[in-house]
Structures are given as C-alpha cells and as structure tokens.
Amino acid sequence: MSEGTSKPSSGRLTAIAPIIIVLLLVAVFAKRLIDVQDGLDPNQVKSVLLDTPVPDIDLPPLPERGPGLATENLKGEVTLVNIWGSWCVACLSEHPLLMEVAAENTIPLHGIAWRDEPQASLRWLARNGDPFDLIGQDPFSEAAIAFGVTGAPETFVVDSAGVIRYKHVGPITMTDWTETIAPLVEQLRQ
Amino acid sequence: MKIYAALSAVTLAVLVATTSYAVEPDEMLADPALEERARIISQDLKCVVCQNETIDESNASLAQDMRRLVRQRVLAGDSNQAVLDYMVDRYGDFVLLRPRVTGQTVLLWFGPFALLLLGGLIVARYIRRPSITTVQALTPEELAEVEALTKDSNTRNDS
C-alpha cells in the first residue's frame, strides 16, 4: 500500500534538479559573456606588480640617443613607460596617440625597446616619429620580464614615488586615453 | 621494399618524438647538474605568450629569454623554489603550469574529486536500493483467507 507514495517531494526534486543545474550554468555563462562585452577580457592577466615599486632596471640607450632608462628616471613625477619594438605591428597602431601625448608635452613618456635591433628601432622612430623622452634597450627581455610583460605594446603608469599604478595591455585607443589613463595621471598628480 | 622501410622509419620517428624541446645548445649551462635543474624549473613555468606550453617546450622569443633568466638565477645560486618565486613575483600564479593550492584554486584542485565522490555516493545509493521488493511468506491466517477466497471466487469479500 505505501509503495510509491512514500517520498513524493524527493522524487519531484530529482526530476527538476537537471533543470536547475542547466539554469545555473546558463547564468554563469551569461555573466561571462556580459563581462567580455563590458571589456573584461578573461584571458588578460592582472598584473601582480600593481601598487609595487618599479623593478630595478638600468637599460643602455639606443646608439647616439642617450641616456638610457633606469629606475631613478621613473621617480619624482608621474611617468608613462611604453614597451614597444619595431617588429610590433600593434605598436604602430597606437603610435599616433603616443605622438599626440608627446606633443602636449605634459607627461614624460619613456620607451623600452624590447627585443629589437638598435638600428631597427632607430629606423622605425625616424620613419614614424619619436614620441619618447628616454629610451632603454632591452634585447634579452630582462626589463620586460621584470615588468611582467606578456606582449607588446604594454604601457605602465608610474607615480611620482616610482610605484606602478596602472598597466595597459595592448595598443592604447583614444577612449583608453581620455577615459582611463589621462584621468588617472591627473589624479596621481594631486 | 626500400620505400616501405623508409616509411616505417618516418612513422616510428613521428611516434617516438612526442615531445620536442626548444632549448638550444648555446643556451645550455656547462654544468650538467645545473642544466638539469634549469630544465626541471623550466618545465614548471608557463610560456606567457602561448599559455599552454612550458617555457622548456616553447619557441617563443619571450620563453627563450625566460629560460635564459632561469639559468642566470640557477647559476647565481638560487634554489628551484626561489627561481619559481622570482617569476611568480612578476607574473603571478598564472606563470606556474601547476597552480599552487590557494583559496582561488582549491576548487580546481579538489573539485573533480568532490564530484567523483558525489557521483559515487549517488551510484552507491541506487545500487543499494532494492530493485525488487522482497516477498514475505504469508502467515497461516493469510493463507486461510486466500484459500477461502479462491474457493469462493465468485463472492466478493469487502473486508
């Protein structure tokens, strides 16, 4: 007599459990998609170096374009450090913006010529314009690894105490500049 | 026949050569013991460009430079752990091919085992649940009742 009617609630739960699981999964995936749409790239590595002092570097200059770039050049005022190379296609796409920033002449913009032939770097700058104040050569990625760089271009905002405050991965767009980097620089100056 | 032999040789070579290493002769350390340590460390470090290869396997230029740095640190007398820590300080846990057990990675490490355990429990419950209800022998009273019913099958018994 009691068979079959003993646990009706547990039976119902088992029946709807798969639906609940599917709905939960849909929610998780949907959140991920929305994140990506909002510009949160899940593949992007958040730098562990944020809010830590810039690494110790002492990079030689490009030939006849001295001096090079050392850690002490990144202290005393807010600076930008851009990792680039003549081989880097994406660097070319952000170059006009860097030229504009240099023309405004409001913030020192330093370059690290990453894994590049010095002559190739110089030719590239001669052809496309040279927005940099100081440039250090990094032929063996010593500075790049010290900065936790995964690809070029990357740009760091360093405050006046020589602490890394922001890292931008990939080419800087006008939107990145006006909405994120420029306001941050302004804020760090106060 | 010759072609057949050559084909088998190529096939064998492809089958045997499952892993290739990117370390070039001029990168290697002179001391074989230190070189061996550098290889071991390199196999724990992820190529941050390609992300699914160790720096030991990767031909990316940044991986090459990371191998060089690993060898410099080993030569300078760093322990294996110190070299890994050096990289983690710059790239975060992301650079390790075997993620460390932290609050963030605990699900990654033990989640599969928890799921296996859960699945096992569910299966065990299904197996233990008797599929056929065991039939108990009738009591003498019940037997008598059945007897009475079958004898008088046309009469309905409401009790």
Predicted regions and their residues:
Chain A
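Thiol/disulfide oxidoreductase modules built on the thioredoxin-like
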Residues: 126-131, 138-189
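Hydrophobic beta-strand anchors of alpha/beta hydrolase catalytic cores
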Residues: 80-81, 109, 155
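Short gly/ser/thr-rich secondary-structure transition/capping motifs
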Residues: 37-40, 60-66, 135-138
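A short beta-strand-turn-helix
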Residues: 57-80
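A generic structural signal for alpha->beta connector loops
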Residues: 51, 56, 106-107, 131-132
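N-terminal targeting signals for export/organelle localization
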Residues: 1-60, 190
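Aromatic-flanked redox-active Cys/Sec active sites in thiol-based oxidoreductases
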Residues: 82-88, 114
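Structural microenvironment flanking redox-active thiols in thiol-disulfide oxidoreductases
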Residues: 92-129, 138-145
